[in-house]
Regions:
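Amphipathic alpha-helical binding modules
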Residues: 81-119
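Charge-patterned, phosphorylation-rich low-complexity C-terminal interaction regions
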Residues: 75-78
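N-terminal alpha-helical interaction modules that lie
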Residues: 1-71, 85, 98-102, 117-118
Length: 119
């Protein structure tokens, strides 16, 4: 019952996890996809996040947290999706840094994101 309640509270995080799986992030091989592939999967899943509008934001992490009310888990999944896309490397690094600063500041240690920052 508790799992059901948590999933209901984090529908966006669950949706992002499904998208990550479809993009190949949950497999043992390194995924290879473009930002266009991510947008297509968002559209198929009817994800409420407008990726173009999000990436135009000065601070996409703040936007996700404050406007979309994304959970820590959802943010972690979203950043992982973006990190493995063909988004500009400097932009990915900046977004990853902002996400780590936000999550670490809350006491949510993300092994996945810290591993990405060290690669």
């Amino acid at each position: 019952m508790e799992d059901f309640i948590l999933r209901e509270l984090d529908r966006l995080g669950e949706m992002l996890l499904i998208i990550a799986r479809k993009l190949g992030l949950q497999e043992d091989v390194m995924p290879d996809y473009s930002l266009l592939d991510v947008k297509d999967e968002f559209d198929k899943a009817v994800c409420p996040i407008n990726l173009d509008a999000l990436l135009e934001q000065e601070n996409p992490v703040w936007y996700l947290v404050e406007t979309e009310k994304i959970s820590d888990y959802g943010l972690e999944t979203f950043i992982e999706i973006l990190f493995h896309s063909d988004l500009d490397e400097d932009r990915k690094a900046a977004i990853l840094h902002d996400a780590l600063a936000y999550l670490d500041g809350k006491g949510f240690f993300s092994f996945k994101l810290h591993a990405l920052s060290n690669s």
